[in-house]
């Protein structure tokens, strides 16, 4: 029963998240002009970091507060155990947010539509054909973010364990430290990146979304290499903070890039394909790649700091090259978008 419930919850969350973000990106692109799109998507994207931080803080509070309580009886549901009540408490605010969104957010007027199939779903083959026409742009974004994601998710998975093995901290304290850094500096970096994108767009640099991605990946690379190699936590913490900040600068840039070069009726599907192409390798091989280097290159569990440095350095360098390769293609995609865009 427990396994079935957890699996059902995980499936439902996955479907919800996979549906929400592509649709949200497309709606935001209809609500805001190009010169404000970076900040708008950045504000939305900070939810990743703020949510992760709140999950740690509020989730920990809920577990500590409720775990020792006695089961309670609720109408219809019957006896509720403490662990079940914990899920209910942390999940209930979601219903409040759903109600607020349902009654305050309306469907925006669609802009930048290429097809005449108003109100009908566009065939998936048409989306693939469009992406093939812009293959240099989408290819560089997909490959660049898959490679960068391997480095990033490798760090997310192993940083607490690295701090424990290398610097002797308790795993709980290490996780809380990195979680706090990730939440605060990640949100700050995302907002900064969105503001810089809009400022440069207003100055006439329309290719800034993809160009800045390459720059931000390049900026984050040395911090990914050096953070695990610091001899003390006194030095590792500021390096970790800079890594979180520079890595998050690009968080809203690819959504901006995809929304600007893709017609309205294709945007959500294009974004979904981006998530599939980038997150599958990142989540599938991020943590695994660090473990493989640790086991088969160094054959030493306490060499994890070297593994993090190598995986981070190699993957981020390749990701930067891939994104830089797409800059010219992105400029060409922007030029083609003038055929169907409502505004210049």
Labelled PLM ranges:
Residues 1-9, 226-239:
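Helix-loop junctions at membrane interfaces in 12-TM secondary transporters
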Residues 97-104, 221-230, 309-343:
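Multi-pass alpha-helical transporter architecture, strongest
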Residues 39-67, 182-190, 275-287:
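Glycine-rich segments within core transmembrane alpha-helices of 12-TM secondary carriers
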Residues 8-49:
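Cytoplasmic helix-loop-helix junction between adjacent transmembrane helices
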Residues 198-216:
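Cytoplasmic membrane-interface "Motif A"-like loop-to-helix N-cap segments
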Residues 107-142, 166-169, 343:
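Juxtamembrane intracellular "pre-TM" segments in multi-pass secondary transporters
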Residues 134-193, 247-251, 255, 282-290:
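Extracytoplasmic gate region of multi-pass secondary transporters
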Residues 44, 48-103:
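Helix-loop-helix hairpin linking two adjacent transmembrane segments in secondary transporters
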């Amino acid at each position: 029963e427990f396994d079935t419930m957890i699996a059902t919850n995980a499936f439902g969350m996955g479907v919800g998240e996979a549906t929400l973000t592509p649709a949200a990106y497309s709606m935001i692109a209809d609500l805001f002009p190009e010169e404000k799109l970076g900040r708008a998507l950045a504000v939305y994207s900070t939810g990743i970091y703020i949510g992760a931080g709140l999950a740690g803080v509020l989730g920990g509070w809920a577990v500590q507060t409720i775990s020792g309580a006695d089961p309670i009886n609720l109408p219809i549901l019957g006896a509720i155990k403490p662990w079940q009540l914990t899920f209910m408490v942390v999940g209930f605010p979601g219903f409040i947010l759903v109600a607020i969104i349902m009654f305050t957010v309306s469907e925006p007027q669609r802009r930048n539509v290429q097809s005449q199939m108003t109100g009908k779903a566009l065939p998936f083959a048409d989306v693939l054909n469009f992406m093939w026409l812009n293959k240099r742009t989408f290819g560089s974004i997909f490959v660049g973010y898959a490679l960068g994601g391997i480095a990033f998710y490798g760090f997310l998975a192993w940083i607490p364990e690295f701090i424990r093995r290398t610097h002797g901290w308790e795993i709980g304290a290490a996780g809380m430290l990195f979680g706090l850094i990730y939440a605060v500096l990640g949100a700050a970096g995302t907002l900064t990146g969105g503001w810089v994108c809009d400022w440069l767009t207003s100055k006439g640099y329309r290719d800034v979304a993809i160009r800045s991605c390459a720059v931000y990946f390049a900026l984050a690379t040395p911090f990914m290499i050096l953070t695990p190699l610091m001899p003390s936590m006194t030095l590792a913490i500021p390096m970790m903070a800079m890594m979180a900040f520079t890595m998050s600068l690009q968080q809203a840039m690819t959504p901006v890039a995809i929304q600007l070069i893709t017609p309205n009726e294709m945007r959500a599907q294009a974004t979904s394909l981006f998530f599939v192409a980038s997150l599958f390798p990142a989540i599938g091989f991020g943590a695994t790649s660090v473990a493989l280097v640790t086991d088969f290159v160094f054959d030493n569990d306490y060499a994890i700091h070297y593994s993090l440095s190598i995986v981070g350095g190699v993957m981020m360098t390749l990701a930067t090259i891939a994104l830089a390769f797409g800059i010219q293609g992105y400029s060409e995609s922007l030029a083609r978008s003038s055929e169907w865009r409502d505004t210049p």
